[in-house]
Amino acid sequence: LLGRIHRFGDVVQSVHMARQFGIKNINMDLIFGLPTQTADDWKQTLNDVLSISPDHISAYGLIPEEGTSLFQALENGTLSLPDPDLERNMYDCAISMLHAAGLYQYEISNFASPGKECRHNIGYWTQVPYLGLGLSAASMIRCPDRDNQTDPFSIRWTNPSSFDGYYAMLEQDGIPEEIKETISPEEARFETVMLSLRMTSGMHRGDFLQLHGEYPEKWYGEILYRLKGQGLLELRDDSWCLTRRGMDLQNSVLVEFMN
């Protein structure tokens, strides 16, 4: 259905081999909301995966990608996606079963044993600067010496995808950047909201202050307290966090901040 070349038995074998070679933190990516998939199918998938005790699980709702055979089958009506309520029930089922198995939810789609969270992704969600080396790699740095709220917050760039282009830029000035984007303070504040609210720990007010020079209420106070009154956000341990209902309606919540 998804064009994968492996079966579950191959996955089990790969996990066992990884452990034999000393790898102690193993993640498994799962997709729910597939055409023809039932709630019982999804429960069986979760039980099968939990039987090999992964340290980390990422569970994503299916997003059909244009150009794939699955996308074409959905377009011409050969296949259809499950009802949104069924997909939401599958998500709730994953949260419940994974929590019972000792994998706590630390981000909308990610679950881990304590101490086994994905530090790589957490870096993106908390806007930690990063340097990408090689073809098509992306980088982000904060602008130094920012002294007011109008200076650019950060710069992002992407390296060329072809070796010839990459090498030519290295020879020319030593900086192989193909796409460069300057992030304004306003854009950076929204990205902080968007990324931090993905995490169950939420948007810590002190962290926002350190990044942007003011608490989030300066720019978003009316929105934050309105969403809190609607039961979509809560203020917990000095952090603004999505409630369980807010996680279901995350896209609608973010639209409020975009407006």
Describe the role of every protein-language-model region.
Residues 1-214:
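C-terminal scaffold of the Radical SAM
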Residues 214-228:
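Short amphipathic alpha-helical interaction segments
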Residues 228-238:
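A short, conserved structural fragment
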Residues 239-243:
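Minor-groove-contacting beta-hairpin "wing" of winged helix-turn-helix DNA-binding domains
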Residues 245-259:
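Short, amphipathic alpha-helical interaction segments positioned at domain boundaries
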